[in-house]
Amino acid sequence: MREEGGVMYEYLAKVTRVIDGDTIEVEIDLGFKIKHTTILRLSGINAPELRTPEGVAAKAWLAQRIEGKSVAVRTFKDRKEKYGRYLALVEYHDPKYDNQWLCVNTVMVVEGMAVKM
């Protein structure tokens, strides 16, 4: 992942819930057995709204890949969007690509599940 302005923070986290195609709930491991649950908005992309068939498909696509799994999360210092969610880049292991770490934000755009903002 590359830095997109501002200081970035990187954490390991477990995705506890996929809320929609571009919003997830994660349990972040802060170290020393300290964990924090928060909601993240996938940075730089926009998925269709859940009230549409495309939105339902985007949520299902995302859930299949990361829900309940460990991910790497990069957040931006003091970068919250209008609903108070932190913006994040999220990487996951994809068995389709020899378990390489892939940026889910980018893969969603490439596979037509979201558009770049």
Language model features with spans:
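Small beta-barrel nucleic-acid-binding modules, primarily SNase/OB-fold domains
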Residues: M1-M117
